[in-house]
């Protein structure tokens, strides 16, 4: 059987289901594939394989489906810990999420935690599926639960009043029964996702950024830095900045090479060498980034949301305390930093997810949403994401 060709004609969006345990995330995922993709049964999704991201093992199920206007890649995680790890490592980047809430229970602790995490790690949009409405006879109760969900979303800076909330039963949709709360609710949900979650800007349309992996000096030509273009486009003749670790420098790209061939441009996804005018071999190093002037600034102090590995995952065997000083691995390099814990937090145990403040000994080109690994002597002991830059 030949592999199906991936049709690039429709815009592509990454989404996922989030919410409290047993509220129906996986059943809903299966139901969506029934009407919009190749049907995946519940246990095909629930038995998600383990994968590694930034040294952390995560179980995640990936399904894909499409509506008339878009192609979707959708992630669903079997366990709460997998969600936390997934959202923090960005293993499955989400452009938007479907928050699943059981109408009979209303918002529960993990509902709140997933919304908070979504806010911290930069999931920009959410749509709500109020599941199991067949178990609630009282219309007023449904109204109350809906109000509660909207208030909860608003309390985490999501536009609670505007977010679409679709009522239905994922189980009826799966079984093909009670179409008014089954199939119709799934179609209404995907219509809402199509309309409410915007298509993200493609990587090539964003401002240029390339983490520097290596530096070479070519006699008679100057200094070449190599790396993989993370986003945007670089053209020969462009003015660019070198940001991070040292003072920011501005230079001009005088050449772009790929596989030892000269090109006039490099774009997102390309592994290139960029020739820099007037920069000597000692003037630039791994861990800095090349970027469009003014697009990214260097910072040393930030708030972060992190997951600390368990002993079984290869992490620390003991907790850490305030003023913990590990290395923070950003893009291509380690920088030492000091951790300040939130008031009232005495220590952090392996397996915790936690918010804290970090001060690095050298500045790094940084934006909200940037991912990092926490390392001790080259061994990964955690993963995190910048939730807010302080200075």
Swiss-Prot record:
Keyword annotations: Cytoplasm, Elongation factor, GTP-binding, Hydrolase, Magnesium, Metal-binding, Nucleotide-binding, Protein biosynthesis
- Domain of life per record: Bacteria
Q: Which reaction does it catalyse?
A: GTP + H2O = GDP + phosphate + H(+)
Q: Write out the ranges of the annotated region (G1).
A: 19-26
A Gene Ontology molecular-function term?
Answer: GTPase activity
Q: Which Gene3D superfamilies match?
A: P-loop containing nucleotide triphosphate hydrolases, Translation factors
Which residues are Mg(2+)-binding?
A: 26
* Chain positions covered by the region annotation G2: 55-59
The UniProt record lists the EC number as: 3.6.5.3
Q: Does the keyword ATP-binding apply?
A: no
Quote the function comment for this protein: GTP hydrolase that promotes the GTP-dependent binding of aminoacyl-tRNA to the A-site of ribosomes during protein biosynthesis.
Spell out the family assignment given in the record's similarity comment: Belongs to the TRAFAC class translation factor GTPase superfamily. Classic translation factor GTPase family. EF-Tu/EF-1A subfamily.
The name on file for this protein is: Elongation factor Tu
Q: What organism does the record attribute this protein to?
A: Ruegeria pomeroyi (strain ATCC 700808 / DSM 15171 / DSS-3) (Silicibacter pomeroyi)
């Amino acid at each position: 059987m030949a592999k199906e060709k991936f049709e690039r004609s429709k815009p592509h969006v990454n989404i996922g289901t989030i919410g409290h345990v047993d509220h129906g995330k996986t059943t809903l995922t299966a139901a969506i594939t029934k009407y919009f993709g190749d049907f995946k049964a519940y246990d095909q999704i629930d038995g998600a394989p383990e994968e590694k991201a930034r040294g952390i093992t995560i179980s995640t199920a990936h399904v894909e489906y499409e509506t008339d206007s878009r192609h979707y890649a959708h992630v669903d995680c079997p366990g709460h810990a997998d969600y936390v790890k997934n959202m923090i490592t960005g293993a499955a980047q989400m452009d938007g999420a479907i928050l699943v809430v059981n109408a009979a229970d209303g918002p529960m602790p993990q509902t709140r935690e997933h919304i908070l995490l979504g806010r911290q790690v930069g999931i920009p949009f959410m749509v709500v599926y109020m599941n199991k409405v067949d178990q609630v006879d009282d219309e007023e109760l449904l109204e109350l639960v809906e109000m509660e969900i909207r208030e909860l979303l608003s309390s985490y800076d999501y536009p609670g009043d505007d977010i679409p909330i679709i009522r239905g039963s994922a189980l009826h949709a799966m079984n093909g029964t009670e179409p008014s709360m089954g199939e119709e609710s799934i179609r209404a949900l995907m219509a809402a996702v199509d309309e409410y979650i915007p298509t993200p800007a493609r990587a090539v349309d964003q401002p240029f950024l390339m983490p520097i992996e290596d530096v070479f000096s070519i006699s008679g030509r100057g200094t070449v830095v190599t790396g993989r273009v993370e986003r945007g486009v670089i053209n020969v003749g462009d003015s660019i900045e070198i940001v991070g670790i040292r003072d920011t420098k501005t230079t001009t790209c005088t050449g772009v090479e790929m596989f030892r061939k000269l090109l006039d441009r490099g774009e997102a996804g390309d592994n290139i060498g960029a020739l820099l005018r007037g920069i000597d071999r000692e003037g630039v190093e791994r861990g800095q980034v090349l970027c469009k002037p003014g697009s990214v600034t260097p910072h040393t102090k930030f708030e972060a949301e992190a997951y600390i590995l368990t002993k079984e995952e290869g992490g620390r065997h003991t907790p850490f305390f305030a003023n913990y000083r590990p290395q923070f691995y950003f893009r291509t390099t380690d920088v030492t930093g000091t951790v300040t814990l939130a008031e009232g937090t005495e220590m952090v145990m392996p397996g915790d997810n936690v918010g804290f403040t970090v001060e690095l000994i050298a500045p790094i080109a940084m934006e909200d949403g940037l991912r990092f690994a926490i390392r001790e002597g080259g061994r990964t002991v955690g993963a995190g994401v910048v939730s807010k830059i302080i200075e």
